[in-house]
Amino acid sequence: MAYKLLIINPGSTSTKIGVYEGEKEILEETLRHSAEEILKYDTIFDQLDFRKEVILKVLKEKGIDINELDAVVGRGGMLKPIEGGTYEVNEAMVEDLKIGVQGPHASNLGGILSNEIAKEIGKRAFIVDPVVVDEMEDVARLSGVPELPRKSKFHALNQKAVAKRYAKEHNTSYEDVNLIVVHMGGGVSVGAHRKGRVIDVNNALDGDGPFSPERAGGVPSGELLEMCFSGKYSKEEVYKKLVGKGGFVAYANTNDARDLIKLSQEGDEKGSLIFNAFIYQIAKEIGSMAVVLDGEVNAIVLTGGIAYSDYVTNAINKKVKWIAPMVVYGGEDELLALAQGAIRVLDGVEEAKIYK
């Protein structure tokens, strides 16, 4: 049976929705919200009714009867650290999404919106593999400063989806393989997946790992300390240097990897150096994750928007092909990944996890 699902993925100025029958997409819409509209609301949670109305209006216009849905799936938000999987939305989760226990983020509305619509039609609401998925081993959490433990914040939804896709295409299960998965987008995350769990990964938001189009990645801590206390920058300005204005933006004033690739291909000296450093840092992180997996790696999987570039993937492969074969799944399909997570539960392949 092909389940009919509504998928909701809220962003800061848009809400992406999809309607699926099984894994087949029958509708995809990006509902854009103007800055003026968003600014009317003091908090992200205050946008709930507005976003819900917009979603229901578009579904009606497109001839989608919500009463025919089997479930509603939302993008998971900044919850407490949880293990990966599909979670049924419950009151404890809704409360934590409302307050944003790990910070405010538009994705916090995903679970709440899905729950609101599912309640109206008497169906179940789910979230799948939010960014706060944390399966790190205790040994990976120590940083050298007890007050600053390493944290798991990464592209969990896409990393898990492509890892499961690899397993399926190779007639095995995610729980039976060891993979190094590299997501390359606005941020870069490199995860060590051992038998179905991401036992180590860089904090791709504001922690460590390779620099990326907009993020600094790991930086020298002594110099960062000097910068923080120099009196030249506010806390917000320093944070912007790490997230938003770091990486390619800082070095080349662009957040588009294609610009850097073009400069490198044309032999531009500065552009080539930045591009080579980007490849170098990703390859180095892959190498460290190979050590985490004791050298037992079935494959290195590259994904995210930048993985569409053969120039990038070939450059990485040149450095790491001695570790394991490389597989490339360019881009990311978050709506499909969310649908697949719900289908696994509805089909009885997995049990829905309970958020506490």
Curated annotation (Swiss-Prot):
It is found in: Cytoplasm. GO terms for cellular component: cytoplasm. It comes from the Bacteria. Keywords: ATP-binding, Cytoplasm, Kinase, Nucleotide-binding, Transferase. Its EC number is 2.7.2.7. PROSITE patterns: ACETATE_KINASE_1, ACETATE_KINASE_2. GO terms for molecular function: acetate kinase activity; ATP binding; butyrate kinase activity. It catalyses: butanoate + ATP = butanoyl phosphate + ADP. Gene3D superfamilies: 3.30.420.40. CDD domains: ASKHA_NBD_BK. Its main location: cytoplasm. Belongs to the acetokinase family. This is Probable butyrate kinase. It comes from Clostridium perfringens (strain SM101 / Type A).
